[in-house]
């Protein structure tokens, strides 16, 4: 069975992420969406919330499993799951340069583990989790940029934060 992992912080999952997951799920018999930690990011959703949201987004996909591995190296997660590939999504050349460097580190750690890069659609190439959070923070509507469960969770999170500030 060909297995792959799609690691990320997914704070929150965007339509671009979902698009890459769906494309990868057609390429591999089993795809693990792995909720991980990026130490350089400030999170809006905690690990459990990110895990639950991802599970909701992909609940109808039989060959996709969502798991959390917040304190492990990507290569170690791939080994643990017997995955032969790491899937990463690209929006632009900035992403390419970043992902090339990560793929190089991963290849150094495990020369047999490959990275598969998938491009998002041009209409999704500007979407980033950071921009989504910023837009929501200032009251913008992102419902066309994220899956429905994510849009609802963002609205609720914003409402709760606004209530706490009052």
From Swiss-Prot:
Protein residues bound to ATP: 9-10, 17, 89-91, 99, 124-130
Gene: coaD
Keywords: ATP-binding, Coenzyme A biosynthesis, Cytoplasm, Magnesium, Nucleotide-binding, Nucleotidyltransferase, Transferase
Enzyme nomenclature, EC number: 2.7.7.3
Xref: InterPro entries: Cyt_trans-like (IPR004821), PPAT (IPR001980), Rossmann-like_a/b/a_fold (IPR014729)
Top-level EC class: transferase
Gene Ontology MF term list: ATP binding; pantetheine-phosphate adenylyltransferase activity
Keyword Nucleotidyltransferase: yes
HAMAP family linked: PPAT_bact
Residues that coordinate or bind substrate: 9, 41, 74, 88
Protein's UniProt keywords contain Membrane: no
Record-marked site positions (Transition state stabilizer): 17
Protein name per Swiss-Prot or TrEMBL: Phosphopantetheine adenylyltransferase
Pathway noted in the entry: Cofactor biosynthesis; coenzyme A biosynthesis; CoA from (R)-pantothenate: step 4/5
Subcellular compartments: Cytoplasm
SUPFAM superfamilies in UniProt: Nucleotidylyl transferase
Quaternary state and interactors: Homohexamer.
Assigned GO CC terms: cytoplasm
Alphabetized NCBIfam families for the sequence: coaD_prev_kdtB, cyt_tran_rel
Cofactor: Mg(2+)
UniProt record, GO biological process: coenzyme A biosynthetic process
Superkingdom of origin organism: Bacteria
PANTHER family tied to this protein: PHOSPHOPANTETHEINE ADENYLYLTRANSFERASE
Organism (species): Lactobacillus gasseri (strain ATCC 33323 / DSM 20243 / BCRC 14619 / CIP 102991 / JCM 1131 / KCTC 3163 / NCIMB 11718 / NCTC 13722 / AM63)
Family, similarity comment: Belongs to the bacterial CoaD family.
């Amino acid at each position: 069975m060909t297995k792959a992992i799609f690691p990320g912080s997914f704070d929150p999952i965007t339509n671009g992420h979902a698009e890459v997951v769906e494309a990868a799920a057609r390429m591999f018999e089993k795809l693990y969406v792995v909720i991980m930690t990026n130490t350089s990011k400030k999170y809006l959703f905690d690990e459990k919330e990110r895990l639950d949201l991802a599970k909701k987004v992909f609940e109808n996909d039989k060959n996709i499993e969502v798991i959390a591995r917040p304190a492990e190296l990507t290569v170690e997660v791939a080994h643990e799951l017997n995955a032969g590939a790491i899937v990463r999504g690209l929006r632009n050349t900035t992403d390419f340069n970043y992902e090339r460097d990560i793929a190089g580190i991963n290849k150094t750690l495990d020369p047999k583990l490959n990275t598969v890069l998938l491009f998002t659609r041009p209409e999704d190439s500007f979407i980033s989790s950071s921009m989504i959070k910023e837009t929501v923070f200032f009251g913008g509507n992102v419902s066309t940029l994220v899956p429905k469960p994510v849009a609802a969770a963002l609205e609720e999170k914003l409402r709760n934060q606004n209530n706490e500030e009052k």
